[in-house]
Curated annotation (Swiss-Prot):
It holds the Pfam family Toprim_4. SMART domains: TOPRIM (SM00493). It comes from Yersinia enterocolitica serotype O:8 / biotype 1B (strain NCTC 13174 / 8081). This is Recombination protein RecR. Belongs to the RecR family. One of its GO terms (biological process) is DNA recombination. A zinc finger (C4-type) spans 57-72. The keyword tRNA-binding does not apply. Keywords: DNA damage, DNA recombination, DNA repair, Metal-binding, Zinc, Zinc-finger. Signal peptide: none annotated. Residues 81-176 form the Toprim domain. HAMAP family: RecR.
Length: 201
């Protein structure tokens, strides 16, 4: 079937989004063109502006249109002394929603992966080391993903923190709230048993 070259181009562009295949891209394109052209224009304008204006925070490397993000610019956050290391800006959003962390962040934009040629310099560990050297940091909380690469990255950063006398801690991994033990994988259950907490009366 022959269609408009512009329509084909739109559908192909939409496929760059994660989880969007040919059918999903086609539905999105037809939805915008048939029922929500004003929404499509807003989307195009927001995308164009975001792609051209959003960069990285000079301190934590998260996404921001300023030199320093709002978290790093917050004096109360600066006085906290804690830095939480995460793999992506999306992880910051997830942690912020809990309301349990009042420090600052450092975004790796990935993890160590020698097989893929990703070393310490590729995920900004030189910048993190500079912060350890120049700032007063009381604790580095390692919130990398519970994967082989995430654990290796956390161990590497933990050793680096030790060189500067900075406490490094790893977020706990275990059985999810509301989960059933028989459905939990062995690795997660092992972490849960190793990280068990005493019951206080």
């Amino acid at each position: 079937m022959q269609t408009s070259p512009l329509l084909e181009s739109l559908m192909e562009a939409l496929r760059c989004l994660p989880g969007v295949g040919p059918k999903s891209a086609q539905r999105m394109a037809f939805q915008l063109l048939q029922r929500d052209r004003s929404g499509g224009m807003r989307l195009a304008q927001s995308l164009t502006r975001a792609m051209s204006e959003i960069g990285h925070c000079a301190d934590c490397r998260t996404f921001t249109e300023q030199e320093h993000c709002t978290i790093c610019s917050n004096p109360r956050r600066q006085q906290n002394g804690q830095i939480c290391v995460v793999e992506s800006p999306a992880d910051i959003h997830a942690i912020e929603q809990t309301g349990q962390f009042g420090g600052r962040y450092f975004v790796l934009m990935g993890h160590l992966s020698p097989m893929d040629g990703i070393g310490p310099g590729d995920i900004g560990l030189d910048l993190l080391e500079k912060r350890l050297e120049t700032e007063t940091i009381s604790e580095v909380i390692l919130a990398t993903n519970p994967t082989v690469e995430g654990d290796a990255t956390a161990n590497y950063i933990g050793q680096m923190c030790g060189q500067y006398g900075v406490l490094a801690s790893r977020i706990a991994h275990g059985v999810p709230v509301g989960g059933e033990l028989e459905m939990v994988d062995g690795t997660t259950l092992s972490h849960s048993l190793a990280g068990r907490n005493p019951i206080k009366y």
